[in-house]
C-alpha cells in the first residue's frame, strides 16, 4: 500500500520502480542455461503481445462505434457539440467495402497492378505537392500565434530583449515550466532568424508535415505492404487535410510528431538490422520531440516497451544501448531546458500546477465547457492557494477524491462521461485544425480574402467535418479489422508498437485534459495499421476463412466487426432524439 501511494504521488518513483523490475527481468532472461528463465521470458512476451492486442482491440471497437454514432463539432467558443452521424449509411459503406475486399482475389486484373519505381515517384511527387501547398498556405494566411504558442514566443522574445517578466513567480513560465523546451526552441529560432520572424517556425512545420507523410509510407513498407499500399497510406495522409492546416500552429505538435515517427522508424530498423547509429539517432529524435512537446513521452514509453519485448524475444542484449540512450535522453529533455531557461532568466522555475489539478479538469463533467476539457479550475485553485503549489495540490486531491467517490457511487455516470469526452476528442473529424486557423484569422490585424474567411468559418467547418467523418469511420474500421480479423500472414512485432502508443494515448486522455489537437498525433500514427487491416482482409479466401473459424476464438474474432456495426445501430436508435435535437440546435447557432 505504501509503494502504491508513493507511485501515485511521485511519478519518477513509479518510473524507476518499473524500470528496475524490467532491467532485472531483462538481464536475467539471457541466462541460456536456465530453462525456467526461458519459460518466464517467453511467457512475459506472449502475455505482453496478447494483452496489447486485446486492449487495443477493445479501444478500436470503442472508437469505431463512437465514430459511427457521433460527430463532434467545434464552434468558435470551443464548446463541443456532440451530434448524430449518418450511422446507417456509414455501416452500409463499411460492410460493402469489406465484402468487396473479400472478392478481391477473384478478380484477376486487380492482381496485376503496377509496382516499383513509377509508384515510388508518384508517392514522392504527392508529398512534394502537399508540402508546396502547405508552404503556400503559410505565406498566404500570415497567421500569428495565440495563447500558449504566443506566450512561449513572448517568453523567448523577452529574454532576447533583456527582461524576464514571463519567468517570475506567478507568471506563465513559472506556472507551465514544461513549456521550457518549446520556449528554448523559440529562443533559438528568434536568435537566428530575427525577433519579428514568426514564419520561420511555420515553414519548419511545412517540412515536418512532409516528413510525417513520408513516415506513413515507410511504416507501410516495414509492415510488409508493397508500393501500392504505401502510396495508398500516403494518399490517406494527404486526404486528412486538417494535418496540413497545423503548419500555421506555432507549437510543437507537427515537429514533435515528425521527430517521434522518425525515431520510431529508426528504433524498428535497429531491432531488425542493428547499427549503433540508428540507436543514437532514434534516441535523439525522440528526445527532441519530448523537449518540444512533453506529450510525446507516451511515444518514448511505447518504444521502450518495444525494445524490451524485442530484446527478450530475440535474446538480443544490443537493445540495451537504445534503452540506455532513450532514458538519458528523456531525462535531459525534461530537465535540461528548464535549467537553461533558469540560467537565461535568472529566475527559479517551480514544478508548476500539480498533476492532480490536470486530473480534476480531465475528470470533471462541467456544463460550461466540454467534458474533461480545459476549465479555469487550475487558475482558480492557484489563486485560492496563494500561489502555493503544495496547498493547491491538497485542494485538488480533495476535489479529485470527491469526483472519484461520485463515480464509484454511480458507475454509469462515469461511463457516460467517458463516452461523451472521447467523442469530443476522437470523433471531431477536423481535430481542432481549422478551428485554430479560424481563431487566428479572426484575431489577425490584416483581414484575409472573403473566400478564405468563408472556408474557415464555423458554418463551412460543419460541412467539411461531415465529409471527413466518412474517412474517420473507415480509419477506425480498419483498426477493428487489424485487431480482430485473423490474419492470413504472420503479424510483425513492430505493428504492436503503433498499437501500444495509440492505446497509451487513449487511456492517458481518458483522465487528462481533452482536446482534439492532443489526440490528432495518435490518429495519424495508426493510418498504416488501418490500411493493413483492409489489406489483410482482401488476402482471405473461402478456405482461409473456414480454417480461421475452426477454433471458437476464430469465430468470435470474425464476429467482432459485425457486433460493432450492430452496437452502433442500436446506440444510434436509442439516442436518435437527443442527438437529432442537438444537431438542429447547432445548425441554428451556425
State what each model feature region is.
Residues 216-239, 491-500:
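Transmembrane-helix signature of polytopic, membrane-embedded enzymes
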Residues 341-445:
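Membrane-proximal stem/loop segments at transmembrane-domain junctions that anchor or position
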